Amino acid sequence: EEAVLPSDVEAQLAAVNWDRRDVLVGTLRNAAQLKACLDGRFYYIPAALVTEEDKPIHYVALFQTPRVFPGHAGIFWYGAVQHSALVQRGSILEVPQTHGSPDAPYYRYQICQWLPLPTPIRPREAGFVRAFTNLFLLENAEFIPELLLGSEEEYRLFLELKRRVPAAPPEGTASGFAWEDIRVLLADGNIRMFRAEQALGSCSIQSFIRYPFAAFRQLYAGQALFQRAGPPLPRVRKAHDHESAL
């Protein structure tokens, strides 16, 4: 059985350029910074966290991490970048500096308008200072780690596993699906992935239920899962998150 998505998602997916990661997902130190950024329609980040390979950035999404925003964590707001500038931290007057040098270089992104996501993206597993994704994933992800998927293959397989695992076959029976040269088998409490009949990796169904994205990485074993230019994306963390030095 082949992994098939709804027709509207198929149409969007066909137009995605997976090499284009032009959405900056940034974190926040506190609620005051969130308010200042929303009111002033801007976001700022240490220049060291954005490499030349990460440019250009066309959108910014605000990740309210569980540690800083308990009870209201996730991505609720995003916006298109109107213009950007390399500035000194001391020039960002909307948010008073509490540490570091006022001469430290920062990128300041002016946002056309902050827009609410129709369905907020909920945190699960992943923690990072910043990450880069694409607009398709931002508009379709249910959980934060899904923003880190790096190809159409990964997206299709991950969503199909999310759909099937809750209804995994009882002991002694099996089910599965395929996409191009990838075959996934659910049997005997485990998930196994094969490419061209060669085993890639496996994980338990229970581990996928508890930590789906970490388990998904195991299915790819020695094969690179996250495909993007520049430094690799952060590894998934299970229990905590980090905020940037903003």
What are the residue ranges of the model-derived segments?
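Acidic metal-coordinating catalytic centers involved in nucleic-acid phosphodiester chemistry
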Residues: E1-A11
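N-terminal "first-domain core" detector
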Residues: E10-R20
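Structured alpha/beta reader/binder surfaces that contact nucleic acids or chromatin modification marks
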Residues: W18-E180, L185-G189, Q198-S204, R210-L246
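Short, hydrophobic beta-strand segments that form beta-sheet elements in well-ordered domains
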Residues: R192-F194
